[in-house]
């Protein structure tokens, strides 16, 4: 009997314990293939330091980054019917919901809150893409409507950060009903004379693009975001033609007049604050080329609305 094997090694193992190493310590940049340590990525707002590629940012992290001091009032998730169609494909919809809730520690895809950005009060609504692809269902639609109602009650602007694959197929027509519901909510905010700004993130597609994501007074997009109704591959297979390089990206849509500005993630809070202060006729510090561009975009929007 080997006393080292049978006695010493088990004792050492029991004292030290077995460490489970997370499988997401290093994250690969989709653009360059560079491996980035997850802490470095988080500290840089989920933007790859070398390439500048904008990764998907968790919804709660985005709200904390947006609001002054990371402080805001988080809105409660409205209570709605769960799995009303008792839907099942390769897996029960109810099980998919449970898995997404465990993964994201959220009730559904929408996270919303009230706070200040450079002292300006606003409501922000963010999609969590990791919750079933940020898809729009009954719970998400209700959360969005409630957020608009809160903005109207507070008499403050609303900023939307969509990141979605579109309507949630597991809820069928009940999901599609959220398109007109959210559109009406946007109209009510505008009737109240309050600004509505959309910050388009990667990806913004499907029914979300066909409704509240493209109804803003101003549309800002993050660099390289895919913004479309149907995806490039689907269109190419339908028309049997190759689409232009960069088709449906933020930069392509800016060039063709579909979005107003492409703004890097680090600059979004300041850009929103300046823009909203101008729209709400509050004093705003305007310096530099980016601010001049913001002013020109706002003036152009006013001219179109007039």
Curated annotation (Swiss-Prot):
Pathway given in the UniProt record: Lipid metabolism; malonyl-CoA biosynthesis; malonyl-CoA from acetyl-CoA: step 1/1
UniProt-listed InterPro entries: AcCoA_carboxyl_beta (IPR034733), Acetyl_CoA_COase_Trfase_b_su (IPR000438), ClpP/crotonase-like_dom_sf (IPR029045), COA_CT_N (IPR011762)
Subcellular location: Cytoplasm
UniProt KW keywords: ATP-binding, Cytoplasm, Fatty acid biosynthesis, Fatty acid metabolism, Lipid biosynthesis, Lipid metabolism, Nucleotide-binding, Transferase
GO molecular function, one term: carboxyl- or carbamoyltransferase activity
Domain CoA carboxyltransferase N-terminal: 25-294
One Gene Ontology cellular component annotation held by this UniProt entry: acetate CoA-transferase complex
Major localisation: cytoplasm
HAMAP family: AcetylCoA_CT_beta
Assembly behavior: Acetyl-CoA carboxylase is a heterohexamer composed of biotin carboxyl carrier protein (AccB), biotin carboxylase (AccC) and two subunits each of ACCase subunit alpha (AccA) and ACCase subunit beta (AccD).
UniProt cross-references to NCBIfam families, sorted A to Z: accD
Family: Belongs to the AccD/PCCB family.
Protein name listed in UniProt: Acetyl-coenzyme A carboxylase carboxyl transferase subunit beta
């Amino acid at each position: 009997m080997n006393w080292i094997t049978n006695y010493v090694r088990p004792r050492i193992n029991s004292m030290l314990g077995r460490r489970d190493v997370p499988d997401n310590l290093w994250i690969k940049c989709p653009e360059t293939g560079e491996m980035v340590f997850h802490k470095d990525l988080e500290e840089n707002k989920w933007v790859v330091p070398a390439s500048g590629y904008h990764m998907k940012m968790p919804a709660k992290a985005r709200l904390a980054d947006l609001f002054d001091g990371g402080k805001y009032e988080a809105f409660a998730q409205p209570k709605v019917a769960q799995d009303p169609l008792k839907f099942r494909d390769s897996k029960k919809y109810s099980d998919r919901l449970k898995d997404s809730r465990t993964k994201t520690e959220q009730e559904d895809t929408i996270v919303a809150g009230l706070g200040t950005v450079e002292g300006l009060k606003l409501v922000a609504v963010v999609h969590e893409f990791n919750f079933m692809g940020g898809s729009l269902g009954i719970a998400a639609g209700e959360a969005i409507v409630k957020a608009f109602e809160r903005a109207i009650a507070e008499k403050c602007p609303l900023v939307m950060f969509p990141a979605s694959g579109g309507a949630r197929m597991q809820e069928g027509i009940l999901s599609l009903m959220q398109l007109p519901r959210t559109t009406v909510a946007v109209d009510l905010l505008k009737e109240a004379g309050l600004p509505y700004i959309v910050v388009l993130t990667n990806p913004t597609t499907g029914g979300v693009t066909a409704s509240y994501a493209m109804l803003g007074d101003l549309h800002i997009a993050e660099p390289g975001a895919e913004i479309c109704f149907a995806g490039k591959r689907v269109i190419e297979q339908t028309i049997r033609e190759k689409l232009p390089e960069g088709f449906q990206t933020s930069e392509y849509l800016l060039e063709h007049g579909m979005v107003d500005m492409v703004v890097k993630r680090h600059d979004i809070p300041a850009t929103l604050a300046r823009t909203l202060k101008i729209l709400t006729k509050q004093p705003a510090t305007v310096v530099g080329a980016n601010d001049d561009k913001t002013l020109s975009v706002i003036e152009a929007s006013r001219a179109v609305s007039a």
